[in-house]
C-alpha cells in the first residue's frame, strides 16, 4: 500500500492535483488555469483538450515538485465541474465540439419548447430529480447533435461518445479503454432515472440521443481502471473514486448523517443536504440528486445551485476593476458599516434555485449620491450570502426543519466578513473546518476507501475539525429588513432578457 492518494480536481476555471497522506494532510498542490471561451452572449465553452492537458500537466507537476514517486500513490480520485458536456469521436479521440459548460444558456429555447409538454416536465422532475433547465447536460448533447455538421449521423452509427468531465478524464487516463461515469455525475445529466438507477429511455428518446453514446454508470468508490504513471513501463495506479464536485464536498465535509448540510462558495454556490435513502422531491425550487453511491447503496441529497457566487467578485475585479485581487474585497467592504442600501443581484447568466429564471439579468439597485465603490463591493459580497439564504429557506421548508448549523468550504469561505454576514442574515451557526479543500478531500476519500487506504466512513468522520465558528448577531427586525430589500431587488431582474 502506497503512502498517498492523489485527487484530480477539474474545476470551472482551473485544473488542480492535490496529494493527501493518510492523516488528510496536504503534501502538495499544483494548479493551472485554462481558457474560458464566450462565443456569444450567454454561451460558455472550454476546449476539452485543454481540460485534459491542464489536468494531466498538474498531475505530473505535483509529483515532480514533491518528489513523490508513482509507486507511493495508492489511488487516484477524480472530482469535476458537473453537467459540462463533452462529445468525442471514439475512434480518433477528438472532440467534435468544445465542451459546453454548465453555465452556458444556449439551449434555453430548447428547454422552453420541452416545457410546453407539462406531462414531460413533470416526468423529468419525478424521475431525474431535476427541473427542465439549460443547466443540465441533456439539452447540451442535443444541441451538439443538431448543430455540429455530421455529428448526428456519426452518433447514430455508434462512433461518438458522451461524457461529463469525469468520464472524459478517465477515458484519457486509460487510453480510451474505459467509458464510465459515477452515480452522482449521471444524476446531473437530466437523462438518468435516479429512482430506478438507469438511463431513462423516455427522456433520451425525446431528446433524440443514441444510447450508444452514454457511459456505463458505476459506484462513486470502486476501481474503474488503471493509468500508467511514469510513461511506458511505468507504475499502474488505480483510478478508484469519482464524484461531481459538490457531492465530493459533501463527502469531504463528512456530511454522512441524514440532515447534515454544507455550502461550497466557489464560482457558484452549492448547498447540499444529505437526505439518506429518502428521495425527497422539492416543492421549493430545489433539485433532488444522488449524494453518493457506494457498494450499490445510494444516498440522496437536496441541492440548491447559485450560478454566480464567488464569480461576482471576479466581475468586480475584472470588469468593474474596483479591486486588483479577489482577496481585497473583504478589506474594501469593511471600510463601510453596511451596504448603504445598495444591492447587487449577480444574475449574469440567469437565476438558479429557487427561482430558475433563465432570462433574469444582473443589476445594481439602491444607488444614491452617497454610494461609493466600497458599498458596491460590499453589496457584491453580500449577494453571495443572500442567495445562499434563499436556498437555506427553501431547504428548511422541504426538509421540515431548520438547519442547526451549516458547514462551509470553497475559496470565499475564507472571507470572514462574508461568513459572519451569512450567519447573521440566515440566523444560523456557520462552521468552517480546518481543511477547506473538502472537494478534493472527498475525491481522495472515495478513492482511498475503494482500495483500503482508509477503512471506513467512521474512521474518516473522526478527522473533521472546526477552524472557526460564526454565530448570528443580528436582531430579527434588522435581518428581516435586509432580506426584504434583497427580495425586492431580485423581483426586478426577473424575465429581463425575455
Swiss-Prot record:
Activity control mechanisms: Activated by phosphorylation and inhibited by fructose 1,6-bisphosphate (FBP).
Binding site for ATP: 12-14, 267, 310, 314, 411
Binding site for ADP: 12, 16, 267, 310, 411, 415
Protein name per Swiss-Prot or TrEMBL: Glycerol kinase
GO biological process, one term: glycerol catabolic process
Root EC class: transferase
Subunit description: Homotetramer and homodimer (in equilibrium).
Entry superkingdom: Bacteria
Catalyzed reactions per annotation: glycerol + ATP = sn-glycerol 3-phosphate + ADP + H(+)
Ribonucleoprotein keyword on record: no
UniProt keyword annotations, A-Z: ATP-binding, Glycerol metabolism, Kinase, Nucleotide-binding, Transferase
